[in-house]
Amino acid sequence: MDISLKTKYEKLIEYIASFSSAAVAFSSGVDSTFLLYAAKEALGNNVIAVTATSCSFPERELNEAKDYCRQFRIEHFIVQSEELNIEGFAKNPKNRCYLCKRELFEKIRSIAGEHGIKEILEGSNLDDNGDYRPGLIAVKELDIKSPLREIGFTKAEIRELSKEFNLPTWEKQSFACLASRFPYGDLITEEKLKRVDKSEQLLIDLGFNQLRVRIHNDVARIELDPKQFDKFMDESVRTLVYKKFKEFGFSYVALDIIGYRTGSMNETLDLDK
């Protein structure tokens, strides 16, 4: 392990150990898994994991969260997010993520309080400062701790240490909630979210790893790692994807020639309005 990275990790452990106990918002993603691992090392049995499940959170992600907590013997709580019932959320406003995160952290705080736990930890990292992240406003408002950002961990460093610690997520692709697949202002429904989930699961089953299926009315815009474009353009793959996507309810299926990138729905977002 790189000396500077080792020192940074030691600072992380020291930071978390300053709390008597903590609840970790755990999605089974790269960041929250690494954070939960560190919290377990720092606090032992005085840490719990809380995962929110909803129609915008695929079952495969929930199952991975359950498996990890069983493997590392971490007490795990699952809460129903029900974000579609949050006032204004379904209209998909620019602050959609804020509305959801605020509700989520309040539920986590309630569970933590029932177990005598004061501190809530979440897994945003230093790289998250460079994108539009309204959810971080809720983090600040509710005094949620962000140890990875506080210590200054980048995504690359988190992956490197995750590999060092043999965490199953060290090379897992980034995931964002399914509600992020729609242009701001487009109505979000449970049916639409299920359509996205089925579409992305099909591509995963076909061997594609880094991907998003963005929805523009009846058009599915597929973002893939450009290195996998040739695989996608195989006639048998294209034909199958088109056939299945039509069954899912899409009229048109398009491959984004730029390829996968995080937050592509933010590219046309005017934050001044």
Question: What is each model feature region?
Answer:
Residues 247-262:
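A short amphipathic beta-strand at an alpha->beta junction
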Residues 122, 149, 153-155, 159-203, ...:
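Mid-to-C-terminal catalytic subdomains of enzymes
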Residues 174-186, 219-223, 260-265:
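Flexible glycine/acidic-rich beta-alpha junction loops that bind and position SAM and/or redox cofactors
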Residues 263-273:
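Short, low-order "capping/linker" segments at domain edges
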Residues 215-217, 221-234:
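A short interface-forming secondary-structure element
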Residues 208-213, 252-254:
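A short linear hydrophobic-aromatic micro-motif
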Residues 1-164, 205, 220, 236-250, ...:
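ATP-dependent adenylation/nucleotidyltransferase module used to activate substrates
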Residues 78-80, 213, 257:
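A structural preference for short, hydrophobic beta-strand core positions in alpha/beta folds
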